[in-house]
Structures are given as C-alpha cells and as structure tokens.
C-alpha cells in the first residue's frame, strides 16, 4: 500500500478551511469510479498518485485551489519585497534601532501612543501589557495570552531579590515555558504593565477547542486581543519599523529582544530565554530564525540583572550596580494591605495568589509614587 510523506502540523483553523474546500467541491461518479475534489496544494498530482494506489480501482482527480503565479508576477512580488517589505527590511530596521540604542525610545513612544489613542482603560492596559511583556520575555503573543494566572510564583534572584513568573502550559509545541516580571529601572517596566492589567482588565475564562482537554480555567488575555493590537499599531504607531509591509506588530518584541541580546554580546541567552531553535546556542541573525520552539530551561540570574538596567557587566563578567543609591528592591519597602489590593485588583484576587498580588501592588505603589 502507498504511504504518505512525513506529516506536518497545521493550525486547527487551517485544517477546517481545507476540509471545507474538499466538502464543497467533492464529486463522485459511481459508474466510472472517479472521485473529484479541490484542495489547497501546490502539487496535487502527488496526492492523486498516493490516493490512486491506496484506493484502487477508484481514480482520483485533484484540482489545486492554490493560485499559480506567472514568472512576471513572481518577479514583481520579489521587487516589492526587496524594495519595501520582507525579512530583510525588518532585519535592517531592527538592527538600526538596536545599534542606535533606540529600543527604550521606541517602547516608550509606542506606550505614549497607546495612552493617547486607546480610549478604553481596559484596552489601554492590555495593549501596554503586550508591548512591554513581549519584549522583556522575547515572547509570542500566544504565550502571553495562554499564561495561567493561577500559576504565578515568586522565585529568588541573586541580584533582584525576587522575580515573578507565570507558567504557560499551552504553547506552540506543547512544551511549557515561563513569562517573567521583574523590576526595570526605566519607565517601561513589566511589573507596572502587570499592575495596570490587574487594575483595569479582568481574567479571561480559558478558551479551548472541542478536542482539547485541560484543567486550566483562566487565561491572561482575551483571544481577540491579537487582532486588536495589530490593527491599533498599524493605524496609530508612526515608528518606521511598523510601516514595513507585513512587518511584525505583536511579534516585534521578540525580534527586538533577540537582536538586543545578540548585539550586546549576550546571544547565548537568546535560545533559553526566547525559546528560539537555531541549531546553535547563539542566534546570530538580528531577526531570530524562522523555526521557533519552546524548551524548559533555567534562566540565569545574570540575565535579569542585565535587563533590569540596574546593573552593568564588568570586564571580568560580574554584574555590579550602576548606582548604589538605586536598588531594585527600593519600591517594596512597605507592603500593601489586603483592602488596597482588593480595591485595585478586583476579580484577580480570586484567581492569583495573595503573595503575588501583594508583591505587584507594593512595587507599583512605590514606583508610581502614590503610596499614602
């Protein structure tokens, strides 16, 4: 019996779309024993050959719905990609941003745009959360969305005392990873983004396909936010990198972080932190490689020291405070009360652990300077 070539994974939505094409086009001639249908495939004759051998004497006629482009059309498309869009343009623009040390300017600029243009407070908090957390975790939007808010925990850190992390079980390759939150000596701060999300939005009941079995009851973000975010950035953000046709919007953070770490001679941290699969320990390209997998790996304390902007790496490789008067634990001197936390975070208090909410709220009140 004939066998198919190695199977490849497809998104559920893609599978449903292709199945619909078959159902809507299938025809069967009983007398001639011929089955006809359309399918989204570049080389339908390969599928036909396998089906003919497998189900003989039935003969299959498979027509492709995939558009066949002429050489003229392909040449025109390549000219367009070379001139304005594509991975090369994205790589060049991100390299420019990283080398000019404009990452913080870009992030704060987009944050200001969100503050001015997103009029609904919950949407404003969600958009900022995606912008900031995707960068500081070199993360996909889907990982941010699928994080389980009941799985937050505080872990010890040699330089920052403690960092916060939340577990993501449902990832692209079904291998768990963590999303991290830690003090950053900039206005763009993942802990403040998390505080704003807790304050303005609500936990979302876990969405699942009918075939999925999971005990997870909640997720951090709503499913439709990816579309909202990409549309908002495309409409309102004026930075050059967002003007590239088919360029990254919600995925920009992971490209920026991978390039930032590589440019600052910390490329060995890209794969374990961002879960990139590059075939090497170090990602050399400024835009991380196309293959992307999740791996559970211990993230070194030094990475968070570097990203916090409180520390600088010495020639010997150690990390020391940039300014001894500025400590990453400065803003958690006074703990928030249960009443303050409940008033600020509402429904999240029923989902997230008390110690986690206390840490986030205390930090935010201290850094934002609004503690009584």
UniProtKB/Swiss-Prot annotation:
GO molecular function, one term: DNA binding
Keyword rRNA-binding included in the entry's annotation: no
Catalytic residues of the enzyme: 292
Keyword Plastid among UniProt keywords: no
Keyword annotations of the record: DNA integration, DNA recombination, Plasmid
Pfam families in alphabetical order: Flp_C (PF05202), Flp_N (PF03930)
Biological process terms in GO annotation: DNA integration; DNA recombination
Ranges for domain Tyr recombinase Flp-type: 85-367
Family affiliation: Belongs to the 'phage' integrase family.
Function: Catalyzes the recombination between the large inverted repetitions of the plasmid.
Name of this chain's protein: Recombinase Flp protein
Organism expressing this protein natively: Lachancea fermentati
């Amino acid at each position: 019996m004939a066998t198919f070539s190695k199977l490849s994974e497809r998104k559920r939505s893609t599978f449903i779309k292709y199945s619909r094409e078959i159902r809507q086009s299938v025809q069967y001639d009983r007398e001639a024993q011929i089955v006809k249908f359309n399918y989204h495939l570049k080389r339908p004759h390969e599928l036909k050959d396998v089906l003919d051998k497998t189900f003989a004497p039935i003969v299959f006629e498979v027509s492709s719905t995939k558009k066949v482009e002429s050489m003229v059309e392909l040449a025109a498309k390549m000219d367009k990609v070379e001139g304005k869009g594509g991975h090369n343009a994205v790589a060049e623009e991100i390299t420019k941003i990283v080398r000019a040390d404009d990452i913080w300017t870009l992030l704060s600029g987009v944050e200001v745009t969100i503050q001015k243009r997103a009029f609904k407070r919950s949407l404003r908090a969600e958009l900022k959360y995606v912008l900031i957390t995707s960068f500081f975790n070199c993360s996909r939007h889907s990982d941010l969305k699928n994080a389980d808010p009941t799985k937050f925990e505080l872990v010890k850190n040699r330089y920052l005392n403690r960092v916060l992390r939340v577990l993501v079980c449902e990832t692209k390759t079904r291998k768990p990873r963590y999303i991290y939150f830690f003090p950053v000596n900039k206005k763009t701060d993942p802990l403040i983004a998390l505080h704003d999300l807790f304050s303005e939005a609500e936990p979302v009941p876990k969405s699942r396909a009918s075939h999925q079995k999971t005990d997870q009851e909640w997720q951090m973000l709503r499913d439709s936010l990816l579309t909202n975010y990409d549309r908002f950035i495309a409409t309102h953000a004026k930075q050059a990198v967002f003007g590239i046709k088919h360029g990254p919007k919600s995925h920009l953070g992971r490209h920026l972080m991978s390039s930032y770490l590589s440019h600052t001679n910390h490329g060995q941290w890209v794969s374990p932190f961002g879960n990139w699969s590059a075939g090497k320990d170090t990602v050399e390209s400024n835009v991380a490689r196309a293959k992307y997998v999740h791996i559970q790996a211990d993230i070194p304390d030094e990475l968070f020291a570097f990203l916090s902007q409180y520390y600088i790496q010495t020639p010997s490789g150690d990390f020391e405070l940039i300014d001894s008067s500025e400590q990453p634990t400065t803003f958690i001197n006074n703990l928030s009360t249960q009443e303050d936390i409940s008033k600020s975070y509402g429904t999240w208090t029923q989902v997230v652990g008390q110690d986690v909410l206390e840490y986030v709220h205390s930090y935010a009140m201290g850094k934002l300077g609004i503690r009584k």
